[in-house]
Amino acid sequence: MYDVKGNLHEVLGSLPAGVSLVAISKFHPNEFIEAAYAEGQRIFGESHEQELAKKVASLPEDIQWHFIGHLQSNKVKYIAPYISMIESVDSLKLLKEINKQAAKHDRVVKVLLELHIAEEDTKSGLSLDACRELLESGEWREMPHVQICGLMMMASNTDDEQQIASEFDEAAQFFDEVKAKYFADDDAFCERSWGMSHDYHIAVKHGSTMVRVGTTIFGPRIY
């Protein structure tokens, strides 16, 4: 078996105080998750609601599941009963649906607003202006079953570490702007989710409070 235990501790040991780890377990078997769980890891990230449902049914109840992939509004109802955080909110429509479905289960679902800062068109997320527009509308203030806890983004897929760092900096500056304008008195708005296996070491130097690491811990994905 892949050395999940050793890899996990290596990643955790490299994170500064105050940075949490989302172990990205999509396409990895339950025994890998159980190995990380046995070492104290509790936050795991998935991006397919059907795969997630199977894992939720068969793994410990105190795992905090984060949804990290593109989420269609019509799929929210399947994860609303148990999801801990949805990191990939990229529209007001999706936010409304999360609030609606969470209400049915009398839950408050934590969410992050996903930004699109990277150069690739393939990455989803809100442009900075679209994010400002969503927040300016104020509609989210009328959603008692959703708690906006911060921002999420992916840097461009490049070997240029300066570019990656500048994109993380741009996200960090935008976080400060949004925090001051809309969430100054809201301690829950505190998360900056950026950094993955190939660039989390840069992200933690540029404002990240939450890194999403899979391959470095679990090895290549098993499709």
Name these PLM-found stretches.
Residues 208-223:
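Gly/Pro- and small hydrophobic-enriched strand-loop and loop-to-helix capping segments
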Residues 1-198, 204-206, 218:
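Conserved alpha/beta-domain cores
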